[in-house]
Amino acid sequence: LFEVKDNTRTLKFSGKLLSESSSWRRGSNRWIEFSLYKTDNGSYILSRIGVSLIFHGAACPLVKRYGLSEVNASILSKDAIPCEECEPSKSAVLVFPEKYRHWAQVSDDPNAVLDALYKYDQGGARYLTKVADRLLEVAADEDKGIESVYRIELIP
């Protein structure tokens, strides 16, 4: 049984993990992790997690903007990184770590998976990021539905 978070909700299902991809690189403070599943009944579940190692001080404007909650600094991970704007100290009693941002989409149509992964530049041109492209490349080897919409695109 798989569990995928969608904000504060949890999706539980049986199926197969088709692919995973991450934008993490050495030295990254923030990155995206994608997972693509196919349920036993044929639905696709696309999961995206925005990961952050950054923490803030109480006076940082990002605390309010992101809706961050205070925690005792002693529970910070050893990998936690102070915000470059507010420069909080790890020796502070209370800090405001950025939250992981969980998002998921359930769809019966593999086209909806691609549509969710497409980005648009300022001129309106559609493209796939490298992390999305890697996710789909592996998933296409595992699933005919993804392969049929990813490898060949019909242009009207």
Where do the protein language model's features map onto the residues?
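Negatively charged, low-complexity tracts enriched in Asp/Glu with abundant Ser/Thr
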Residues: 1-25
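Acidic, serine/threonine-rich low-complexity disordered tracts
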Residues: 30, 34, 55-57, 61
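Low-complexity intrinsically disordered segments
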Residues: 81-156
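Predominantly late transmembrane helices and immediately cytosolic-facing juxtamembrane segments
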Residues: 41-43, 49-52, 58-59
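A short, sequence-level motif marking secondary-structure junctions
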Residues: 25, 52, 109-110
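Long intrinsically disordered, low-complexity regions that are acidic and Ser/Thr-rich
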Residues: 63-90
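Amphipathic, interaction-prone secondary-structure segments
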Residues: 16-44
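Alpha-helical membrane insertion/targeting regions
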Residues: 6, 54-55
